[in-house]
């Protein structure tokens, strides 16, 4: 089921870090759009439902945002989550993954085909890809350096999963003094028992303390408004 939640009824969005946007100082980061989460046949597939998109549907919505951002001159980076095959860098992740996948599965291990970025994604070869074994795309990577070197102020975050890597990346973006924007229709979460609870709570946490939560259509409207403002100046 595609995204169909009413954010205004679920999240208090009055306080914003990005009431307007400057595309020239904006960056798009695509988090963990890997086969394990996006392929309906994969071990970690995110099924969605109850108004939130599936991993497969996020491929479509994320590509739509990627294409529009490129039209606005916004650069794109990517990240992938995974651990070494022997688990030597996994830390506490292995303790948690046993709960997620009680029947096993090697989807999060480098070298497994499921760990690769979904080939349907509109990724260009020259765009940076950051690999790490922890939730935040900033931790142990060069993402912060790319953003600061390009004088970025606004960081759009899309991808998987909402309550894990997207939320943690948005938090670290705020910690580094960027203005994070998470697109609710371009992410989804693991909620095997709680329906939309983890997804909504993660978005509330981002909006309440770190950044802004909106839909891709709302973002595109901001792009259009920025053009009108620039033309009138």
Q: What spans do the regions from the language model cover?
A:
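Short, electropositive alpha-helical surface patch
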Residues: 82-102
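Active-site-adjacent betaalpha module
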Residues: 1-27, 35-36, 64-72, 96-233
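Short, well-ordered beta-to-alpha junction loops that form the rim of enzyme active sites
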Residues: 79-82, 160
